[in-house]
Amino acid sequence: MSKGPAVGIDLGTTYSCVGVFQHGKVEIIANDQGNRTTPSYVAFTDSERLIGDAAKNQVAMNPTNTIFDAKRLIGRRFEDSVVQADMKHWPFKVISDGGRPRLEVEYKGEAKNFYPEEISSMVLVKMKEIAEAYLGKSINNAVITVPAYFNDSQRQRTKDAGTISGLNVLRIINEPTAAAIAYGLDKKVGSERNVLIFDLGGGTFDVSILTIEDGIFDLKSTAGDTHLGGEDFDNRMVNHFIAEFKRKHKKDISDNKRAVRRLATACERAKRTLSSSTQASIEIDSLYEGVDFYTSITRARFEELNADLFRGTLDPVEKALRDAKMDKAQVHDIVLVGGSTRIPKMEKLLQDFFNGKELNKSINPDEAVAYGAAVQAESSLGDKSENVQDLVLLDVTPLSLGIETAGGVMTVLIKRNTTIPTKQTQTFTTYSDNQPGVLIQVYEGERAMTKDNNLLGKFELTGIPPAPRGVPQIEVTFDIDANGIMNVSAVDKSTGKENKITITNDKGRLSKEDIERMVQEAEKYKAEDDVQRDKVSAKNGLESYAFNMKSTVEDEKLKGKISDEDKHKILDKCNEVISWLDKNQTAEKDEYEHQQKDLEKVCNPIITKLYQSDGGMPGGMPDGMPGGFQELGAAPGGGSSGPTIEEVD
């Protein structure tokens, strides 16, 4: 293993970046065009292969042979729903080779096929050459970053891309981890720090929450949108100008690919200008049918065109916080990554969401990931042990792990791609009165119902003292060590009685092929699962609203404050809805929502009147009850039909 300098490479979906640690600091290296980030584009022409800026600059003339977005294909199967959906938007051709996607291009007059990792390796070769030109010596070692949600196959294929490009890949590390390292957050003294990484790049948006303690990174949650980024903001501007061109010149340029591409390039430039100025001008000579297009756009107009997209970025932030079981006040550091976080409006929205907290943005957001990777590369070089280098590829759980709860629902305790070793505990309760025991069934998989997942093992916890349903508290703990061996235990809190099971990697676990298939299936079915989940939540929402409203108007405290007529109006409507619910347990989500709207139409005016007359209502607004514990069913023969476990919020 050569000991030359090691570089850190951020292999991005739309742009890549390379850095090196030398003379005690990180240097981000500019390419031959003077740009510190390089487009992740590879183009094939009848005479040459182009990589980076040169490839992106000629995409308008050569769309079918210019490959980008290879990162969206790497480590995936051709039939994967994600691949199938993306293919509809790509101008280049993707074919299946035994279920693996391959890219078909015409190069020097003949048809050629490449795997995604071969395209990524070409981008890596370019990044390697950029570093070599700057350092004046050959580079062999690199740390390459991947998104936190990449599975084992995507990580392995990224490593393969490095190998194909002639690099010895020291480590594959998560992008949010690299960004946190860039800011030295792992070096801050004191107790554990909760770090939120907000990464809005060219084509993807990722939010990650990490907990860092003593240099150990624990990934708590990830959320985001794999199809939101700078390109979407450009497209809004492009559509705005296509409409303006139509108004001014009565010509529609939308079908002319080259004109649209030239406009898009100008829009991307204008967007960058608007991050530092309040106005940008666009000047394109002979855009369409000889017409020159000279115009301008203000920052305010740009913000208005993208208002919904900007605001929408806060949803994944909230989801990541929920998944990490964290309140926004508990976040110590917020790190901005990705060029789109330079947009002032984006910064302001995020800062306001965190009640004015300072954001970490002193490192160029395009470069933060490569910066951290370079720091990691420097420290990895000192580590000769092959085991340690390879461990990083395997130190996550490839599939979610959980137990079956009421109604055959998969309740996840450990999400897929959680770094191991890890330990999670959750409290459950019984499903029926005087239930003597519970059956704990351990599953792995990504589907909403356990019947679609893989059963790893099961055990019973008996001798629970007789009690009404929902009273006993059973604490279930999943503990996975560094070798992937899992102990699942259940303890009855009142008696301290315990039982457990050990599940090793090989016994009952899935092979790599199976894991790939399952994760793909899960993505394919995710939409169905989400529809099912939404349906159940709409039904539960309607049910609790109706029951709460009923008990609210029947409350003794309201006597004399609500007329009998109003009271009966609400009760009749609630009873009508409850009886409709009994008959329609499997209705569609919109039917439940329609019923809820109808019910609200009756209730809201009356409740509002109450508020105005009384300045408030006992017990607050009836708006969906807080959930109780999730229930665990008894073992067969235990007086309940199968294992139905209820979760505790």
From Swiss-Prot:
One of its GO terms (molecular function) is ATP-dependent protein folding chaperone. The keyword Nucleotide-binding applies. Residues 613-649 are annotated as: Disordered. Keywords: ATP-binding, Nucleotide-binding, Stress response. PANTHER family: HEAT SHOCK PROTEIN 70KDA. Residues 2-386 are annotated as: Nucleotide-binding domain (NBD). Residues 394-509 are annotated as: Substrate-binding domain (SBD). It comes from Ictalurus punctatus (Channel catfish). The N-terminal nucleotide binding domain (NBD) (also known as the ATPase domain) is responsible for binding and hydrolyzing ATP. The C-terminal substrate-binding domain (SBD) (also known as peptide-binding domain) binds to the client/substrate proteins. The two domains are allosterically coupled so that, when ATP is bound to the NBD, the SBD binds relatively weakly to clients. When ADP is bound in the NBD, a conformational change enhances the affinity of the SBD for client proteins. Belongs to the heat shock protein 70 family. This is Heat shock cognate 71 kDa protein. SUPFAM superfamilies: Actin-like ATPase domain (SSF53067), Heat shock protein 70kD (HSP70), C-terminal subdomain (SSF100934), Heat shock protein 70kD (HSP70), peptide-binding domain (SSF100920). It comes from the Eukaryota. The lineage of its organism: Eukaryota, Metazoa, Chordata, Craniata, Vertebrata. The gene is hsc70. Residues 616-627 have a biased composition (Gly residues). InterPro entries: ATPase_NBD, Heat_shock_70_CS, HSP70_C_sf, HSP70_peptide-bd_sf, Hsp_70_fam. Pfam families: HSP70 (PF00012). The keyword Thylakoid does not apply.
